[in-house]
A protein has these predicted regions:
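Short, surface-exposed alpha-helical segments at coil->helix boundaries
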Residues: 18-29, 171-179
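Short glycine/serine/threonine/alanine-rich loop segments
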Residues: 6-7, 37, 61, 92, ...
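Structural beta-alpha unit
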Residues: 17-20, 29-64, 183-217, 222-227
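General small-molecule cofactor/ligand-binding pocket signal
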Residues: 10-12, 40-44, 95, 140-142, ...
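Well-ordered alpha-helical segments embedded in enzymatic catalytic cores
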Residues: 51, 123-126, 177, 204
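A short acidic, glycine-rich active-site loop
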Residues: 161-173
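Small/aliphatic-rich secondary-structure junction motif
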Residues: 1-21, 32, 109-163, 182-188, ...
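Gly/Ser-rich helix-loop-strand patches that form or flank binding pockets
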Residues: 53-103, 207-251
């Protein structure tokens, strides 16, 4: 990823620096593609979340890459693993990897949220940038529409037809909104599809990314996530509790 973005890699190790750990790191690096820019390693003892968050600020990190468990159990969901805590507190964008590999696996399909939000344009722009740098030719923008917008109780053929018409109008509305965003983004040579889904935000796009076997899911960072959002999940919490694939959270 660093080579594709022509970026510097900064490794953060929380714990004591030893000769063995340095040797282990060099062994790992020797098994990967050579870096265009030399790696900088930060060795610091302390509480992992605090050390990493401070490093993000001090080193002016643009993207924090973390390994993450694919599915958290109930205890970890409420207590929060290191990766989840960093996701909520870091000031930069975050890439959560659930299937890291020494040998690069081609990225063939990126799914990105297209919900109506001030952050969405930047998120779509970032997904296109990643698509170009990862040489991915397929991007799907998912517009999640709440079922509450239908406001129709389907109990006969007439109400079913009415619901179908309303769904189509909502879909056209969302498609047009996303098309307006795409007018200002250079997406040449990328196949971009729009997909409207009616359902719960976060859960719906996560399920879609899973069944479509997307290689990367790109999401807006939540505006505010407190304890109530973790008890009554915010849309991003559905994604964090059971990662469907690698996830990029754009801040």
């Amino acid at each position: 990823i660093c080579n594709m973005f022509n970026a510097e890699l900064i490794g953060v190790h929380v714990g004591e620096k030893t000769n063995k750990k340095e040797a282990d790191l060099q062994q790992i690096l020797s098994e990967t593609d050579a870096l265009k820019k030399p790696i900088k390693t930060v060795w610091q003892e302390g509480e992992p979340v605090k050390v990493i968050l401070n490093t993000v600020i001090e080193e002016q990190i643009d993207l924090l890459i973390l390994g993450a468990l694919k599915k958290e159990n109930l205890l970890k969901y409420y207590v929060g693993s290191i990766a989840r805590k960093l996701t909520r507190k870091a000031s930069c964008s975050i890439l959560l990897l659930i299937k890291p590999s020494i040998v690069r696996q081609a990225c063939k399909h990126i799914v990105v949220n297209g919900l109506k939000d001030d952050k969405t344009e930047e998120t779509i722009r970032t997904s296109v940038l990643f698509s170009k740098n990862l040489m991915c030719k397929k991007v799907t923008i998912v517009e999640e529409i709440s079922q509450s917008e239908l406001q129709v109780k389907v109990d006969d053929d007439k109400s079913l037809r009415k619901a179908t018409i309303i769904k189509e109008r909502l879909k056209n509305r969302e498609d047009q909104r996303v098309k307006n965003i795409l007018k200002g983004i250079d997406s040449e040579d990328i196949s971009i599809k729009m997909q409207s889904i009616f359902g719960t935000r976060g859960y719906s796009i996560g399920h879609y990314a899973k069944i479509k076997r997307a290689d990367l899911l790109v999401m807006n960072a939540p505006t505010n996530v407190g304890i109530l959002d973790r008890i009554f999940p915010h849309d991003i919490e559905y994604i964090l509790s059971e990662l469907p694939t690698d996830v990029l959270i754009v801040k």
